[in-house]
Amino acid sequence: MTTASRRPAAPTSPGRIPGVEYRRPPAWANKSPQQILAELRPGRADPLRVLETLIQLYNNQHTARAKTVSHKTRLERAQFLRRYFRDLREKAGYRTIPDPRNLGQRHLQAMVEVWQREQLAAATIQTYLSFLRGLASWLGKPGFVRKPDHYGLSPEEYERHECARDDKSWSAHGLDVEEVLARVTAFDARAAASMRLMDTLGLRRKESVMFRPHEHVVPFARTGLPESEREADEYGWTKGKGGRTRWGAVRTAEQRAAVELARSLVTGQDAHMGDPARSLKRNLRRLDYALEKFGITQRQAGVTAHGLRHGNLNDLYESLSGAPSPVRGGRADASADRA
């Protein structure tokens, strides 16, 4: 799955995350958010109740744009904010949890210091600060959350690197993909087939489990893409980050074989790669367990499931540009990137 995200032809979503939709209580009828919050008087209302009210009112909104955010973002942001206020008491030493409307710079500084002690990854800290900016925007306080260096964070602690610096593929770590998949197949054929989809189509871990091999691979004519961009007779699609449809040409014999194998294992035309008797969460855990069972972990082998997608994208880069990707010793050439 390698072409850019596209808007045409929006097929049915592979699924939603439960537990992140809120129904407006009848008591809120004909009331504005400001009126609802005014009934929760600072100093008297339970701070966590105020937080839940804010989440119900605003959590579906994007921080900076006039649009809604994905169900995944809603879930992760709500979970973080609840944990943040609990951690102010449990980790930062505050005797009482503050009302979200009274959150001050000292509260932000205290939790940044907790994150520093815990040595959280730069990407994690950036995400946490982004979630706090969202809370500030709900409260009408744009600019309340300042730049990371204001809180004493060094660039190494908050600057995330969008481009990979190392080759994270299985082959780069001495693993024979076919040999590993043969062993996994004997244990769990579905898990192995999902891994093969990651390897050949460049799917992410979750995408490989949610992939519906009969529905998600279609003739080019059904993609809605311009004829000038046609690279194969069939294309696969997934719902990428942000809910956008991502199309990718199924151009090689290996890709077609992976799709046919997947189709042979599922139970129906609309079936996904996971075991139908298990939830999405349990199917993802089963995939992780299969990897762990054969030593495919960061700790044991230096790689994760994502290494299959990483290898696919590096191979694609080389096939399109004619040169190895930068992480494989090639030059970081802008003209090659455009290939």
Regions found by a protein language model. Name each.
Residues 1-75, 79-82:
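Basic/aromatic DNA-contact patch characteristic of tyrosine site-specific recombinases
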Residues 58-164:
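N-terminal core-binding DNA-recognition domain of tyrosine recombinases/integrases
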Residues 158-179, 242-254:
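DNA breakage-rejoining catalytic core of tyrosine-based enzymes
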Residues 175-205:
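Basic, Lys/Arg- and aromatic-enriched nucleic-acid-binding interface segment
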Residues 190-191, 203-204, 246, 260-263, ...:
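Short, cationic motifs built from Arg/Lys/His that form the positively charged side of catalytic pockets
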Residues 196, 307-339:
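C-terminal catalytic core of tyrosine-transesterase DNA break-rejoin enzymes
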Residues 210-258:
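Conserved tyrosine-mediated DNA breakage-rejoining catalytic core shared by Y-recombinases
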Residues 250-321:
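Active-site/catalytic core of tyrosine-dependent DNA strand-transfer enzymes
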